[in-house]
From Swiss-Prot:
Its EC number is 2.7.7.56. This is Ribonuclease PH. Homohexameric ring arranged as a trimer of dimers. It comes from Pseudomonas putida (strain GB-1). InterPro entries: ExoRNase_PH_dom1 (IPR001247), ExoRNase_PH_dom2 (IPR015847), ExoRNase_PH_dom2_sf (IPR036345), PNPase/RNase_PH_dom_sf (IPR027408), Ribosomal_Su5_D2-typ_SF (IPR020568), RNase_PH (IPR050080), RNase_PH_bac-type (IPR002381), RNase_PH_CS (IPR018336). The keyword Nucleotidyltransferase applies. It comes from the Bacteria. It catalyses: tRNA(n+1) + phosphate = tRNA(n) + a ribonucleoside 5'-diphosphate.
Amino acid sequence: MKRPSGRAADQLRSIRITRNYTKHAEGSVLVEFGDTKVICTVSVENGVPRFLKGQGQGWLTAEYGMLPRSTGERNQREASRGKQGGRTLEIQRLIGRSLRAALDMSKLGDITLYVDCDVIQADGGTRTASITGAMVALCDALAVIKKRGGLKAGNPLKHMIAAVSVGMYQGEAVLDLDYPEDSAAETDLNVVMTSAGGFIEVQGTAEGAPFQPEDFNAMLALAQKGMNEIFELQQAALAD
């Protein structure tokens, strides 16, 4: 089996995390997984949704979108169509669930964190790149809140989180699929994990033949290997 990119089966794409990419948001990152590029921002606003009023905890919610020409052919903006597509809704819910799992909401205080992930160039793995980049932006936003005198109850961050894709390509488990692999893979799996080694979400779909238990275990092992490398990259970015 030869991957289109020439990478080894267990090799990540080149990953770059650029902090403070925009000047207005409390946290902002440009994350690059190979040719996939996503701008992730975290904005802080006072108050919480109505269903959390008086409960003494904060909230985090996420939105996701793709620029019209982030792909090979221009896609119509969802705003001009008047509604979000099912894929968009699924991905932004995944991003929100994943990031909320990193936080103790009772320590946030009466604030809402708005996470925005905008894909400026897509080459596979946009949802996993969004989660990985948004986590770093979230850390920067929390630092800003603390500097402003917030987080009196302590640090709400329980652990780092990151995400990566794995799949079965030409009968072999591979790590971090780009678009040519993703479009031809027999199985596509998106994995979200904590830096403590726990799983937050595993999304898997067979595109044709079912995958076997040994395939699933091989893909999870690759995801864990890749995730350890990604956590190191996140920490290195935050140390700059």
